Amino acid sequence: MAAITASAQEGIYLGGGISLWRNNDVDKTSFSITPDVGYNLSEKWAVGVELAYAHKGYDGEDAISTNAFALAPYARYSFYENKIVRLFLDMGFGFSTYKEKHVDSVNGFEIGVKPGLAVKLNDNFSFITKVGFAGYRDDYYRNMNGNGFGVALDGENISIGIEYEF
């Protein structure tokens, strides 16, 4: 997943991600759009919310189409920063609804922590990534395998992007 974020120092920041994947072996196409908005309360703390829409479609004999929506508010704590690197934790919870064609929708939630890293490229741009998830998920759209507590370091839990600071 790629993410782009614009940020105002001690103010509003905007961002988002987009992903697109085509698997020819199983005729699967998937994409997601995840806009993000937040507010820097101080140099250490920010609050924000991520919205998400995800679609997966399987072609062929067993054509299946799924759609998911999610809303995930969070608090961001930056615990280390020097001239180039900033380390942070996004702590929050998310609510999702997941619908497969011709099947009832499934509602889910997650609560947990996503660690992140920002590397300053110049005065305005930073490379930013979030790697992993630690917490609890109950039928959340990124993990439809049921309920569980743990740590996830798969491709669904890694985002990479650029941040712009005004």
Language model regions located:
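Individual transmembrane alpha-helices with interfacial aromatic-anchor signatures
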Residues: 147-156
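Short, solvent-exposed loop/turn elements at domain surfaces
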Residues: 22-25
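Cleavable N-terminal export/targeting peptides
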Residues: 1-11
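Short acidic/His/Gly/Ser-rich catalytic and metal-binding motifs that mark active-site loops
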Residues: 98, 137-140
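Gram-negative (and chloroplast) outer-membrane scaffold detector with strong preference
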Residues: 11, 18-20, 31, 36-114, ...
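Outer-membrane beta-barrel porins/channels
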Residues: 130, 139-141, 145-147
